[in-house]
Amino acid sequence: MDVEFFADLDLDALLASFSSSAAAAGSGVSGLFAPSPPHDAEAGSPESVSSRRPSPSREAALSEIERFLMEEGPAAEEGVGAEDFFDALLVDGGEEEEEEEGKGSEAGGSTDGDSGKENEVATPDAEKEDVEAEVDGDDPMSKKKRRQMRNRDSAMKSRERKKMYVKDLETKSKYLEAECRRLSYALQCCAAENMALRQSLLKDRPVGAATAMQESAVLTETLPLVSLLWLVSIVCLLPVPGLPNRNPVARSSAGRDLATVTGKKTSSEQQLEETLLLHGRRCKGSRARIKLDTGPFRLAAAAC
């Protein structure tokens, strides 16, 4: 590759380009390579041979170029490469620009320090609003975007409210269903208890009694108690047997016999009979009336 490059290289044109800048600008890159010799030129002409022989100055330039090319590889390995050089150059230029901007900002900050402090104390919301106002401005597209964002937010909030409302309704419906289920169970229990009481009443009913007339359990239980209370009260109200009369004046047998024959009642007997009648009226049953036979009491009172 290097041999072909040196064969095609025209040293005369290269040296001419170094000596004359105008000639180099006019010829350009095409002047670096030697034009092909004409076909009619003789191969063994003295002019062609003399032109092909390099001069001493050309030999020195050629040797210098060869030395430069030979030393390019080690120099690149030891020194800094082209890419690193350009990167460092760009970085240095950027740092210089940043330093200049920093100096300008420091100068501006010294003149307007209060405004800088206010900007530092500003809240993030205010900064965000300022940025949005600067970016959006009064552009119709920005207004449309803001409106769409507001509509989207409102729709999202409405959906959340709807979800919460539906959730509350579901909770209430579940509670009401549980309450209805509990009440239905209580109703079934009451119906079963009522049926059991009715069966017990029918079982205790005497043979031949009418099944159309049904009595409650409370009345069936209270009637025997009332009858027992009536019997005890009658026994307690029985007159105490009288003591023998110690009065020396004996009663006339005629008067006693007359009262017995005529059947007249004394005041004590009348009061006892009225008391028993009143008590019997109060203790009457619902199915049948309790009749009071006062015959034995009259005989006991007459005997006294």
UniProtKB/Swiss-Prot annotation:
Gene Ontology CC: endoplasmic reticulum membrane; nucleus
Basic and acidic residues composition bias: residue spans: 150-163
Activity regulation description: Transcriptionally activated by IRE1 in response to endoplasmic reticulum (ER) stress. IRE1 cleaves a 20-bp fragment causing a frameshift of the mRNA transcript, leading to a nuclear isoform of the BZIP50 activator.
Induction comment: By dithiothreitol-induced endoplasmic reticulum (ER) stress response. Induced by salt stress.
Keyword Repeat: no
Biological function: Transcription factor involved in endoplasmic reticulum (ER) stress response. Acts downstream of the ER stress sensors IRE1, BZIP39 and BZIP60 to activate BiP chaperone genes.
Protein name in the entry: bZIP transcription factor 50
The species this protein was found in: Oryza sativa subsp. japonica (Rice)
